[in-house]
């Protein structure tokens, strides 16, 4: 077996990856396609840690004419000219968690770095005038049009997207900074902006009316991330090495990777796409884990879920028109655009007749990680004991020991503080939904039957559990409702043994008082 290249985990600079001979999944055909399309202004939205910064860096090396870095890559056979252009590269990644004055100083520092390169010693005061001066200076000194690359253009705004007070203030700062991208158009060769969300009222979208948004185009669907074909061809030896470390066959390793990290689609005709950050971390570590979530759960998403009062069971598994999820974040009537653009739900299907998309949670890493982050909303805190309890519950349920799992859950709930608004069955239903989703089983709530709705359905590899939840009553009352409504008949063709579970919660103790389990 050929010696494997090292993995560029956390490295986002194309030149460093190539010069150090690290693994690079070739995306240069997309670079050539975009730069030779006749367009000038482009925008790409993708979730965090999905390869956007590396893509921007690749464009930078390309426009700097560094042909030697592209040896052996697709673009080497496509490009004949390798013209060098002046490049202004800005990253807004460091502009998070800032007030207006802090953000203005941050932009000033980014501009000062470029002004030093181009010998501007007496810069203007306002950020937009300084950017205009930079573009003019680079254009005049080189005699060539200027390339402007802006990575994570929306980073300063994401943490205040839920705030009606702070968002307009910071948005005006960024609008002022980006405004020259229209005024300087004749001096520009290429403008590329990446981010997570689309803020319609920023000047780049409201004024730059000729910008090309490639975020949902079929021909650019695979521009970021690692496709199934790329994994099995360019990383074939890496898959074999991972399988050996995991003690699995190649097909078993591929299936495990698909279950954990695959499932993203960014267009109606998108290839299967893996999360690149998690995939490379798994290859480097030799094991699967929740790498993307461990790198940080955005607080803005949790805040928006609260703002729109979204129940955990309402996330994913829905149909929507493109305008409902590929939409600006300002004035959102639902959290769907943010969930989609942040990578927590993705396209799973498209019906050309109705022009409706099917959206759902992409994979196991996102499903389990998301519900883990939501759990504190239902138990009041996030504890190590909670994680170990859920792991032990999972083992018990795999052995069909639901009674043992319920005992463990009852003991755990007795140790945690309660939250507000716990005087409804809905609260406990959502808590159970979150907990059992973390166990990585199929869970659904309010499942329709001819005679009513089942509170919760849990499907494991070996059994189908029907839960009825009661508040301040008893487990017998819950079991009687299951039998009276004849819920099991609805699932008779499931092919799995059916188990009925009646559970009662007590408002005073905020815990389970009793439960009853019967096989159908």
Which residues fall in each region the model found?
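Metal-dependent nuclease catalytic cores in nucleic-acid-processing enzymes
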Residues: 177-184, 337-345, 433-437, 481-501
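Acidic-basic catalytic patches of nuclease active cores, encompassing PD-(D/E)XK
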Residues: 411-444
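Mg2+/Mn2+-dependent nuclease catalytic core
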Residues: 168-172, 471-488
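Domain-level recognition of nuclease-like catalytic cores that cleave nucleotide substrates
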Residues: 490, 496-520
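Active-site metal-binding core of divalent-cation-utilizing nuclease and nuclease-like domains
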Residues: 137-142, 433-461
